[in-house]
Amino acid sequence: MERRDSGESMSSWAPGRALAAYHAGVTVICELAVRFAEDAWSAVTPCPEWRAADLAGHLRCMADDFHEYLDDAPDSRMARLMATGAHPDSLARKMARQNAAELAALPDGTGPEHIRAFAASARAYAQRIPAVWNLPHHRYRDTLVTAGGMLGAVCAEWHLHAWDLARSLGKDYCPADPDTLAAGWRAGLPQLPLDLPEDLDRPVASSRTARHPAASCAATPGTAAHRGGHGHGNLAVGVGPAPVEDSPVWAALLRASGRLL
């Protein structure tokens, strides 16, 4: 039997909360970008092969790609790749190669220029989704992902890359509503199961020994102040491992994306 949106219950992934979380991710990326001095765009990111300016360019490429996938759904190049049902590691390698090629082909631009183009494209994408929320976007094995479900993957992508930018600045980032991001992940990324802690009140021990595996930022095939509020997220000064123990759900998302071990 066909399963939709890859979760047992996706009631928390509904257009209102979903779009709020999505726009919060775009906004926090823009807010982080203005904190970079001109020479800071050469700072390393949690993806060792990328500087912050490269990450800005990657965001711009992804935002445009998501429009293409929606234009061509359910027969886009992404849909054809996902329809192979390949192992997640194989999918990640293929997407990483695609991302690297697109970044290499991107016209020269500064970090701020790439972020401005990203924001315009990402916000335009969000405007398109409500009208096609329940239409098929792509399929992975026995799971049909709708356009609304795909927004979940994109939403998670923005917040995870916000974390990457924050780490480049020596700061930490935690989204305002990680529960909604987890629902979006499950709606849009059936190939990457999300293992949440059984006891969500229990601190996540591994969060104090964060690692940044190579290529984790490029491989997700897309891969808010306090819960219930309307802020975009929390930024905290810190140069050590990300202090995520107060948000086990966010820690689980960072692990699922390869950013924490």
Where are these regions (language model features)?
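Structured surface interface patches that mediate subunit assembly and partner/cofactor docking
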Residues: E2-A21, G25-V28, R35-P48, E68-A86, ...
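Long amphipathic alpha-helical segments that form oligomerization/scaffold cores
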Residues: A101, A105-G109
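Conserved alpha-helical segments that form or flank metal/cofactor-binding pockets of metalloenzymes
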Residues: A53-Q98
